[in-house]
Amino acid sequence: MFKKPDVNSYFYFTYGQIHKPALLGIFGAVLGYAGYNQMDKKSVYPEYYDKLQNIKVSIVPNAANGYFSKKMTYFNNSTGFASHEQGGNLIVKEQWLEEPSWDIYVLIDNKEAEKIAEFISERKSVYLPYLGKNDHTADITNVTLEEGTVQSRAAKIQCLFIRDKAEIDKDSVMFLYETELFKYEEALPIGLKPETNQYLLTKMVYTNMNLVNIKDEVWRAGNRDIVFY
């Protein structure tokens, strides 16, 4: 569950995908970097984000058309702070993703990225990584190191990408009538604002349609063409 900040006391909603700040939090836990609770007043960012914000990632949803099913889960919050009175009980509805799975790529182009590759390849972790909250443990499997190559030309991006960095090739869509086309789009966090540490959002897209005017470098990794951000 990757909780959206725009919630009330009774409903907690999730983003539809893991996002870059959440990924950096996982990597920070693996490497043992401090989080929000350890920040001092002089710090602009928590230690994990300060050290890892320049890491480049690529995210591929392992879901039909990019969409994971969501379900509402109910639980009791019996703290006095939550229910506004000692001994009170507040029933909270929380939205979860069902069986989420992603292929995550990290561009190894600096020392912190090299540390991430070393720790994850050797299955080392200082703290337990989790998906959004600590009762959803992150299961990191099938770790490989791959040689990637930058493509001089590409017609598709097979991962989430920033919407403003490419355009749907509308001319090609009419010739793909035998293919089930899809387009997933959502405003997702890509960073933190230095003034408040709140999420910096941008529109992200995942599609099997052909693209034009691709502004990012497209990497071939295995059998996929992906971009990093």
Descriptions of predicted regions:
Residues 1-5:
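Short N-terminal binding/cap micro-motifs at the start of the first secondary-structure element
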Residues 6-74:
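Glycine/small-residue-rich interface belts in oligomeric ring/scaffold proteins
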Residues 62-229:
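Internal, well-folded beta-alpha domain core
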